[in-house]
């Protein structure tokens, strides 16, 4: 898909190209609802009239949002006609156009917004973390333990710990509460004891991706409490639309609850603030789009909610952009930016460096720092 326009302004968008980006994974990214072995994403490339190139990555995750690579490409094809010929400096107006053209395709919006912002920042030689506020250039991420059996959980957690990860996000909700409790307990018991000084830093986060009923979620928490398994946070225990269930779990749980699928817009976050139903909210570019995510951040901060920065099954480009946002804004208690580590092969070169748990953005010269090798 390619379109062009000729103009005298160096900031005018002259081309926009969208291509399938298939990223094989080292293992299926199994959650409640699906287990893709390949991330079928989309690469967006915009060119300004002065030749500046910006790149974006859209990462639709069918199991969570219903979006597909095909629907994302179609949405971007429709958006392209409205975007080419516009001035890249009008980023908010361009975001509004994308919301109008593809309201039900947040991954498409996010990928295009990232490409436009990358082009703008490269033209002005500004790193993305600076654009978002410049709070920091370093982050420490957790690592996801995907859904599976007990041996897989133990082996994955031990390998993650050896690689330097002390925060683990454990996917639950694909099995019964009893089976998940057994798996989480075995995982925890298999990690080093208090003799290891790093064990004091260990954090376990559960993520059900809406796979439980309220009764099942509470059953899991009771089983883990009885087994004396410390849980730092329980993310999205029930389905997005089950607000009563979310209220029920939050009121009866001693473990803090985090909303993910239940928080797709600033309006959703406002409801969470007003009801005090959760203690934290997970922000994802692909779930909401870039500028809606920024609005959600402001509402959550004003309302006193804790913050997690997460993602769908994203490659190095989209993950780097999310890292820039979290580092630049600051205020995030939980960082879940690990899916690029599950990608076995990709076409990118990145100045945004991820060494296991550690993100380092200081070496990024402009934009998000990711190019096609």
List the model feature ranges, each with a label:
Residues 118-122, 298-301, 323-327:
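Short glycine/serine- and small hydrophobic-enriched flexible loop segments
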Residues 57-58, 172, 285, 311-312, ...:
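Short secondary-structure boundary segments
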Residues 2-205, 209-218, 225, 252, ...:
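N-terminal capping/lid subdomain adjacent to the active-site entrance of alpha/beta enzymes
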Residues 42, 313-371:
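C-terminal alpha-helical cap/extension of soluble enzyme domains
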Residues 85, 126, 255, 305, ...:
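Short glycine/serine/threonine/alanine-rich loop segments
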Residues 11, 163, 229, 276, ...:
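Structured loop/turn residues at beta-strand edges in well-structured enzyme cores
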Residues 175-320, 344-354:
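Catalytic core of soluble alpha/beta enzymes
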